Amino acid sequence: MSLQSIKYSRGSLEILDQLLLPGQSKYLVVRGVEDGWKVINKMQVRGAPAIAIVGCLSLAVEINPEDFETKKSLRQEIEGKLNYLVSARPTAVNMKIAADELITLANDLYKDEAINVTEMKQRFLDATEAMLKKDIADNRAIGANGAKAILQRVAETGAAPAGSTGSVRVLTHCNTGSLATAGYGTALGVVRQLAELGKLEHVYCTETRPYNQGARLTAYELVHEKFPATLVLDSMVAALLRAKNVAAVVVGADRVASNGDTANKIGTYQIAVVAKHHDVPFYVAAPLTSIDLAIPGGDHIIIEERPDREMTHVGEHRIAAPGINCWNPAFDVTPASLITGIITERGVFKPAELKEAITKLLES
């Protein structure tokens, strides 16, 4: 059974505090938007899909018990609070897209004279809650599409380890599983699907400094699922790809530009460079909500910078020399030229065909 990072029923929201994993499993009650903003900003919940879901559900929890006198006051509350939630972690586009969609819904309901304020609130809550089910369904589709693409490439190139009967070894970075989504996962969903098909020989996960999402969270999920897995240091990737016959690298995304440039957890770019050198396919697994067609390339993506302490300390213990300066971007941008394919719930696309393909899908 997959881990559950988000527990929700109407009027109640709890999130698994990921800062305490793997040592302690503790759920935090999110009572409203301010709590939602804080748990996102402090990275007690993280992963672009999970950020969007928790942000929007925190608003649902807040407005559920409230009685609004007018549709205008409800619309203003929705718009103001959603825009505030976007500011918690600006690089991840999913929260912005979800906010824009829900604000558009609120405006449409506001303009519909046949709908009263009570029904307007009900429909808004229904739409927000539907995000949970949709995310899990999308993740399963991403997993299926990604596993198919990897296995097809292995069959064409003969890249599977000798004697493996078609099973593959894959590398992943950061955390993209049940803890980063409503469930199942994006890049880790691809790994999960390979395992369900009996085609996963081994998965390697990076520690993912400085926040150690790989060592703390992905390793935690892999052990929980009893997948054959090995943790490696970030600095070991080149040696790993040279020595272990890895069939593919699959990572998640916080924002994908229309040309395929991809912002993901810091360290992704260098893994892509190494994968290119070793002729290992490099895949990005992300829902359509992570693709931002409004920006032409990675240079337009805002990169969040985190506090020095995340680099200089592990818990309360300082590991860096006092007085040293730090540069701590949370993400880097992998150029589209290094990406083999972008795995979505609607198919796998080469970066060069992404904009046209997604535009057609959204119009259909």
UniProtKB/Swiss-Prot annotation:
Reactions this protein catalyses: 5-(methylsulfanyl)-alpha-D-ribose 1-phosphate = 5-(methylsulfanyl)-D-ribulose 1-phosphate
Keywords assigned: Amino-acid biosynthesis, Cytoplasm, Isomerase, Methionine biosynthesis, Nucleus
Gene Ontology molecular function: S-methyl-5-thioribose-1-phosphate isomerase activity
Compartmental location: Cytoplasm; Nucleus
Organism of derivation: Drosophila yakuba (Fruit fly)
Pathway where this protein functions: Amino-acid biosynthesis; L-methionine biosynthesis via salvage pathway; L-methionine from S-methyl-5-thio-alpha-D-ribose 1-phosphate: step 1/6
UniProt xrefs under Pfam families: IF-2B
Transition state stabilizer (site feature) positions: 174
Primary residence: cytoplasm
NCBIfam families noted in UniProt: eIF-2B_rel, PRK05720.1, salvage_mtnA
Protein's recorded name: Methylthioribose-1-phosphate isomerase
